[in-house]
């Protein structure tokens, strides 16, 4: 069985067995959540509740990234389109999502709140 494009790229970059996640800018690539579901990998929006429903088609998502999956094959077909970043961490999907949710807003010097698109590659 030959190596997938993901395995070729990450042969030296990824720790053996370390979980990978994609942080995807769905405003840039709206089919990412659908692609994840089709591949059977977990996918969660960074927004929740009413805001999550309102922004579901453009909200950033955290997606599990198994190296040998239809999702990773699709991801590498998008290479160069700046749709997101990959993260290697021993944390769970829920923990990764919780962490990135803390970075979603910033305040200016007058304490006004703004969305921060930190996930925009």
Question: Which residue ranges define each predicted feature?
Answer:
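Terminal low-complexity "docking" segments
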Residues: 1-121
